[in-house]
A protein has these predicted regions:
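A glycine-rich, hydrophobic/aromatic-adjacent loop/helix-cap motif
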Residues: 133-136, 168
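Acidic, Ser/Thr-rich low-complexity intrinsically disordered segments
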Residues: 92-131
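Polar low-complexity intrinsically disordered regions
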Residues: 23, 109, 113-114, 122, ...
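Beta-rich carbohydrate-recognition modules and glycan-binding surfaces
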Residues: 139
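Non-catalytic alpha/beta scaffold blocks inside enzyme catalytic domains
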Residues: 1-102, 142-152, 157-165, 169-194
Length: 194
């Protein structure tokens, strides 16, 4: 074609159609350039044969893992050792994926100064500051640590109160790091504007 001057009959190409739902057809989170991570709920059923991203990725991953287990391949450890213990492995729930992205303690986490337990084994993390590099924590995306805490889904918060009067609705959704949206000065502002 005009934008891609390649003859498909002369190259080894295979096209896969992956009919995915759009964001409004499944529960999940959306993120924007302001670092806001906001939860949304399914608004409508998907048309036709469309399935969730999670179901598509699960199908690819489980087949790939089986292939690696049976045939081997380059760098098999990340594929064979990846955690995939969702309630419904062939279609992970968005809530479970969000909790895994947030992270949890794989062992009791203690305060280095006092030795007191600050996060119990199995508990969701409240902040990226609780992540450890010794294998005692797990997080799918460190900047999302704090988005799903022991108090629940922080992305689903809908408190639009603005007690400061500055347009900071800190109880609405969640922003990283540590839900700090609106708390940092804009680097474009002069010192007097901060």
């Amino acid at each position: 074609g005009e934008s891609n001057d390649v003859n498909p009959s002369k190259i080894q190409t295979e096209v896969f159609r992956l009919p995915s739902t759009c964001f409004a057809e499944e529960n999940g989170s959306i993120v924007n350039s302001g670092r806001w991570l906001q939860w949304h709920w399914k608004g409508a059923d998907a048309p036709g044969i469309a399935v969730t991203d999670g179901e598509i990725l699960a199908g690819i991953f489980t087949r790939l893992r089986k292939m690696y287990a049976e045939e081997g391949g380059p760098a098999p450890e990340p594929v064979l050792n990846m955690t995939w213990n969702y309630s419904t492995p062939h279609e992970p729930a968005s809530e479970e994926v969000a909790m895994e992205s947030n992270g949890k303690a794989l062992a009791d986490i203690t305060d280095p100064a006092t030795g007191a337990v600050i996060v119990k084994k199995g508990q969701q993390l409240s902040s990226f500051a609780q992540l450890r590099d010794d294998g005692t924590t797990s997080s799918g995306c460190w900047i999302f640590a704090g988005s799903w805490t022991p108090d629940g889904n922080q992305m689903a918060r809908r408190d639009n109160a603005d007690p400061s009067g500055l347009g900071n609705t800190l109880g609405w959704a969640w922003a990283w790091p540590r839900s700090s949206a609106g708390r940092r000065p804009d680097p474009a502002c002069g010192a007097g504007d901060r």
